[in-house]
């Protein structure tokens, strides 16, 4: 009788983490997809997050050292223009593509795929989703600003409208 050989492969169960919002829950690992109980961000597969995070207090210095950085404000047009209450201002030289329009505009942004891009919003709820969308679509150097404009200290890169 021929001997039967069995091979068992142990498949690692997929783990999930929340889209980085800049808070401690970013470090928590979950067993299934869903929403983060702390920040309500979507839970995505560990390893699928390919963007970095920068703290608001580091931003003006970073922009000064990297003047060709694309600053992408994903808030509404009203927020970007300072017509929303409260008005948190924006970053000088920022471009505005509201998150709801971002996916439809990926084609027109293709020329920026290899540029340094910092994505921000008001409270770091929309910008992590936008950063994830960009990084999943071939944008190589995407950074999310933690906390958003609501916690941005005054500085030479901030513009009140």
Enumerate the language-model features and the residues they cover.
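Extracellular adhesion/carbohydrate-binding repeat motifs centered on closely spaced tryptophans
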Residues: 25-27
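Local cysteine-cluster metal-coordination motifs and their immediate loop/turn environment
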Residues: 23, 123
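N-terminal export leaders
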Residues: 1-3
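Short, surface-exposed ligand- or partner-binding patches at beta-edge/loop junctions that are enriched
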Residues: 119-121
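Short hydrophobic beta-strand that contains or immediately precedes a catalytic carboxylate
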Residues: 59, 70-75
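Rhodanese-like catalytic fold shared by cysteine-dependent sulfurtransferases
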Residues: 8-19, 30-65, 78-116, 125-161
């Amino acid at each position: 009788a021929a001997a039967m050989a069995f091979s068992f492969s142990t498949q690692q169960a997929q783990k999930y983490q929340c889209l980085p919002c800049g808070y401690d829950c970013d470090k928590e690992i979950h067993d299934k997809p869903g929403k983060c109980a702390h920040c309500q961000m979507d839970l995505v597969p560990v390893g699928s997050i390919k963007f970095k995070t920068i703290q608001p207090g580091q931003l003006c210095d970073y922009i000064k050292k990297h003047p060709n950085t694309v600053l992408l404000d994903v808030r509404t047009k009203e927020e970007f223009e300072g017509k929303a209450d409260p008005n948190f201002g924006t970053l000088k030289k920022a471009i505005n593509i509201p998150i709801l329009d971002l996916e439809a505009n990926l084609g027109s942004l293709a020329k920026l795929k290899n540029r340094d891009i910092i994505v921000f919003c008001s409270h770091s709820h929309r910008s992590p989703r936008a950063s994830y969308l960009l990084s999943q679509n071939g944008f190589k150097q995407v950074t999310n600003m933690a906390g958003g404009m609501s916690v941005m200290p005054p500085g030479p890169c901030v513009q009140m409208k």
